Amino acid sequence: MSSSTNLMLKKLLALSLITSIPAACAYPSISEIKNPPEVDVSVNKEKAIKLEVVEKKWTCPTCNYNEKYVLEKLQEKTKISDRNALATIMGNIKSESNFIPNICEGGARVNYNQCHSGGYGLIQWTSIGRYNNLGKFAIKYGYDPSTLEGQTAYMINESVFQRYLPEFEGPGKTVDQYMVAAYYWLGWGIKGYRQHYAYNYTKKMILA
């Protein structure tokens, strides 16, 4: 067989290989690119696994029950999310009552209607108006005004707290800055250790 014949056979063989490439290996046409085939994205609802987004909250593992309860309700019933803001509120409550709801100013542990002078409760409600409103709120919503649950609900819903709530809900401030809003909320006469307590809470609280 001559060399020219061999060369021709090789060319024919190469051509046959090229033309026999499967269509799946070829590039898609313009129409296929513009109109891609539909993809089945249906879901079997019975077998589908629901993904739940768990929102993290500030917790205080070393705090007592009363402290944990108030911290939880502050986040559940408001939009406060800043650790310094929460710690400031907690520090002020600790300074006022040490989270003891049935405490009358001076230290006596009595029911709501047995505290006849000074402040009473978690934040030591002192003025006649604020003290009486605690009782009215409790009656209206079925709480005992001497309890942690009743006083926490009143504290969060009280008009004075609601007035300054936006200051606490605004994030990014220092404890010292949030303390200004706390002063107008509580109107304390003696600052005492409340800011020191607040800083301690910032160290004890964790996001979980």
Predicted regions and their residues:
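Non-catalytic cell-wall polysaccharide-engagement segments
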Residues: 2-6, 10-12, 17-40, 131-208
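Poly-acidic low-complexity segments
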Residues: 4, 38-44, 99-103
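N-terminal export signals and maturation junctions of secreted/periplasmic proteins
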Residues: 11-77
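Peptidoglycan-targeting cell-wall enzymes and recognition modules
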Residues: 48-69, 97-173
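Short, charged helix-capping/linker segments at alpha-helix termini
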Residues: 76-84
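Short, functionally critical alpha-helical segments immediately adjacent to catalytic or ligand/cofactor-binding
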Residues: 84-100
